[in-house]
């Protein structure tokens, strides 16, 4: 630890400004098992030493400020300060570093993602000495993660409630996302569910607009769910978006969903906020509702490689805040997502223990200590030809959602749903028989087309559709 002579009561107070690195850069520090660890991608301004910038990040996100203050002498600074304990240059970049910072657990309120992020990604991101700053990863120690409830129910409980095992769940976002009346919206839900999907979904910006108020939508969707369940003998659901302008209104919508007996609701956790999300997760846990989480606004925060917060951090904090599902990208669809990076944060969402693996962007070993898992949701520009890759990439514990890939079927919504269900079951069967979907996936789909005219029609419509653009956020 660096000496703090000027801030200890016995040494007296010395006013003035000093380098951050004299106090907050501690390369000899031995990390404690209870420390919260952060990895920042840091780009200093020209002429600013990396050690000074790393120390500034540690200081400004914990106990420090720009000048010495006399009240430093009234606290145990060595106990509470953040420490930049390691720096490593980023390969291939001339002035970029990974700064590792350790934060004492006592700096953070128990069970509060809001407080955690307010400290770690607060004012420091506007610090002038930094050209850019990105939070790449967090290590949440068991001593802190055990103060969070996590997902309302988790993957296994959801499987048991749905009585569906051994395959990915299938969903569909109702389109057009805005403009339908509640009755027509409910009709689309019914057709998709009776066609073979497990879930349908409100889009992220479906709340309670003049063309479709939330209560009407909830009632018509519930009617569709019950009718489809009766016809198919399967448990069905629709993600009813409870996101609202106030927490009181959000609770009202969640309560109504519970009263009419639907199995799952939805929340936009970034636009709605972590405090609202944690509160809603607790309500869902107490009232038997599954909670689907949409990540609207995430790309504003995580898409740029050099500045912001990586999605793996947003995924970790959502698991702590509470969510049974979370949109995670597709790798193969229309939305940003590199394969190894995506697989890394998918594991962080649903596995109990994840080893450090820099090849997948995982900077720290993460032990969730029994916290329930969050199911990844692949959604955005996917269709039946993507099914082999999605099955191979995500495995069984995922929800694959085909919006346009269901509702765009030339024969209608129910045939579109049937095409996706047939494609999924064909891929799962082929995988279980030992076939390599990465090489034989196209053949598997073509074989299934022989006994499913719905799938054959879907394959013909989308045979030329690809989204091949270079990924911006790479390792």
UniProtKB/Swiss-Prot annotation:
Any one biological process term the GO annotation gives: photorespiration
Pfam annotation, one family: RuBisCO_large
GO MF annotation terms: magnesium ion binding; monooxygenase activity; ribulose-bisphosphate carboxylase activity
Cofactor info, note text: Binds 1 Mg(2+) ion per subunit.
Annotated compartments: Plastid, Chloroplast
Cited InterPro entries: RuBisCO, RuBisCo_large_chain_AS, RuBisCO_lsu_C, RuBisCO_lsu_C_sf, RuBisCO_lsu_fd_N, RuBisCO_lsu_N_sf, RuBisCO_lsuI
Post-translational modification: The disulfide bond which can form in the large chain dimeric partners within the hexadecamer appears to be associated with oxidative stress and protein turnover.
Cofactor: Mg(2+)
GO CC term (a single one): chloroplast
Positions of transmembrane segments: none
Sites bearing N6-carboxylysine, chain numbering: 201
Site feature location: Transition state stabilizer: 334
Coiled coil: none
Enzyme class at the top of the EC tree: lyase
Main location: plastid
Enzyme Commission identifier(s): 4.1.1.39
Binding annotation for substrate: 123, 173, 177, 295, 327, 379
Reaction equations catalysed: 2 (2R)-3-phosphoglycerate + 2 H(+) = D-ribulose 1,5-bisphosphate + CO2 + H2O; D-ribulose 1,5-bisphosphate + O2 = 2-phosphoglycolate + (2R)-3-phosphoglycerate + 2 H(+)
Binding site for Mg(2+): 201, 203-204
Domain of life: Eukaryota
Task of the protein: RuBisCO catalyzes two reactions: the carboxylation of D-ribulose 1,5-bisphosphate, the primary event in carbon dioxide fixation, as well as the oxidative fragmentation of the pentose substrate in the photorespiration process. Both reactions occur simultaneously and in competition at the same active site.
Family, as annotated: Belongs to the RuBisCO large chain family. Type I subfamily.
Complex and partners: Heterohexadecamer of 8 large chains and 8 small chains; disulfide-linked. The disulfide link is formed within the large subunit homodimers.
Other comment: The basic functional RuBisCO is composed of a large chain homodimer in a 'head-to-tail' conformation. In form I RuBisCO this homodimer is arranged in a barrel-like tetramer with the small subunits forming a tetrameric 'cap' on each end of the 'barrel'.
Protein name: Ribulose bisphosphate carboxylase large chain
Species in which this protein is naturally found: Euglena gracilis
